[in-house]
C-alpha cells in the first residue's frame, strides 16, 4: 500500500499541494484528475521522488520513503513525450535499462511483454518509424522490464486518437491486472480517468476535491467543482455525440 500523509508542497511561497492524504492499494489503478495548475503533476513528481516533500510523509508497504532518493524507491514513470532514444530501434529501447541491471528481467520475461503489448513486428523499427500508439507501447515495455513497484503514467493518452487511445487503455488495464501492479495516472480528461481507473483522485487548487470510485463520483459528487468540472464535461460530450447521430438520422 502507498500512503500519503498530510503532504504539503510550495514553490516560491505559493502552496501547490495542501494537506494531501490518501491510500492507494496494491494493484490498484488510480487516476489523478484536475485542471491545469491544480497540482496533479507535482503530486506525481513527489511520489516518483523528482520533487522533495516540504511537509508530511510518503510510506510504501510500511517503509517511510519521504527522504529516500528516487533511484532507491523502485517506482518508474512513462513520461508524456515517451523519452525514447531516437538512435536506437524499438527492441534496443525496450532493453536499454537492462544494461545496468541485467538480471532484473529474463529474456523470456522480455519476450512475454513484447507479446503482451503487440510489439513483435515493430522491434527493428527506429523510433521515427513508429506511430504514437506504438511509441507508447515501447515506452510501457521499457518501463515494465525494470519491474517497477509502482508504475506512474503522465498523460499517457493525450496525444493519441480515439481508436488507439482505447487500445492503450486496455493494455494499461491488462498490465495492472496481469502483474498486480499499482498504477498511478495523471490526466486532465474526466472520461479517461473514469473509464480507466479503480479510483479517481480529483484535485483543485492543490486540495483534494474527491477521492472515490468512478460510480461514486458520477452518482454522488461531493461539491460543485466536481459537478462543473467532471459531470458538465461529460454531459457536453454526450450531447455533442447525440446531436451528431440525430443529424445522421434526419439527413
What kind of feature is each model-predicted range?
Residues 211-212, 220:
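ABC ATPase "signature
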Residues 126-130, 134:
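Conserved ABC ATPase signature
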Residues 105-122, 173-174:
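Conserved ABC ATPase "signature" region
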Residues 145-149:
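A short, proline-enriched helix->beta-strand linker immediately N-terminal to the Walker B motif
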Residues 33-35:
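The feature captures the beta-strand-to-loop junction immediately N-terminal to the Walker
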